[in-house]
């Protein structure tokens, strides 16, 4: 807890004296706009998107889960997010090499994320926090590292912004879901993705 408070103090300093560390284009308001459900008058589970009752039940079964999510569940989550067109944002979150320790230059981005998730528009939603690596290294190692990094982001949000941990599902995908499949080792594949799991 103390470590997370230190992160927040560092973030305040970085935002004031070193704005070059932050992604100036990605404000907390911009994150809210990306993650807020669209208000549409369409049937849930229609071709245009939305969660079916079965998909919602699956997501609900993962909330507050003590054990690690298994391969089949990860695959199903990916399928649900894509089929339902759930609101998503990709973030660059920097960690120590070969580690799940959040670097100081990543803190401003996580502060903006925390402000967004605790805002009035999003505070009742549930979110998937997924960690991704590039294709360098052994698959098993990448999987464990991505799980640990997603867990670090979740801990930051819970510790600093009092986001209900039951509203956050942290999952590691390793190199299973590359952002740029044409270049498996590209830096853009190393990312954290946040998805709003409330049906739009």
Could you describe each region identified by the protein language model?
Residues 2-84:
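N-terminal targeting leaders that direct proteins to extracytoplasmic destinations
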Residues 13, 84-86, 120, 161, ...:
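Sterically constrained small-residue positions within well-ordered secondary structures
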Residues 55-59, 74, 99, 107-114, ...:
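Extracytoplasmic/secreted envelope proteins and their assembly/folding machinery
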Residues 72, 86-92, 105, 112, ...:
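Extracytoplasmic
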Residues 76, 80, 90, 97:
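Surface-exposed acidic loop/strand-edge motifs in secreted or periplasmic proteins
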Residues 93-101, 136-141:
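Short coil/turn segments at secondary-structure junctions
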Residues 95-130, 155-159, 194-200:
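Periplasmic peptidoglycan-binding/anchoring modules of Gram-negative envelope and division proteins
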Residues 132-200:
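Periplasmic OmpA-like peptidoglycan-binding domain that tethers envelope proteins to the cell wall
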């Amino acid at each position: 807890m103390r470590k997370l408070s230190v992160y927040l103090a560092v973030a305040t300093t970085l935002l004031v004296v070193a704005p070059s560390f932050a992604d100036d284009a990605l404000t907390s308001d911009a994150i809210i706009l990306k993650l807020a459900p669209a208000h549409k008058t369409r049937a849930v589970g229609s071709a245009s998107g939305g969660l079916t009752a079965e998909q919602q039940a699956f997501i609900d079964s993962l909330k507050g889960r003590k054990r690690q999510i298994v391969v089949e569940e990860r695959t199903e989550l990916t399928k649900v997010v894509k089929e339902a067109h759930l609101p998503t944002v990709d973030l660059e979150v920097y960690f120590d090499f070969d580690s799940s320790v959040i670097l100081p230059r990543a803190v401003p981005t996580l502060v903006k994320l925390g402000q967004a998730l605790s805002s009035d528009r999003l505070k009742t939603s549930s979110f998937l926090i997924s960690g991704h690596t590039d294709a360098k290294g052994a698959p098993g190692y990448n999987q464990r590292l991505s799980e640990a990094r997603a867990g670090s982001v979740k801990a930051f949000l819970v510790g600093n912004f009092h986001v209900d941990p039951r509203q956050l599902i942290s999952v590691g995908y390793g190199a299973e879901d590359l952002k740029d499949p044409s270049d498996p080792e590209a830096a853009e594949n190393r990312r954290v993705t946040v998805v709003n799991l409330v049906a739009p």
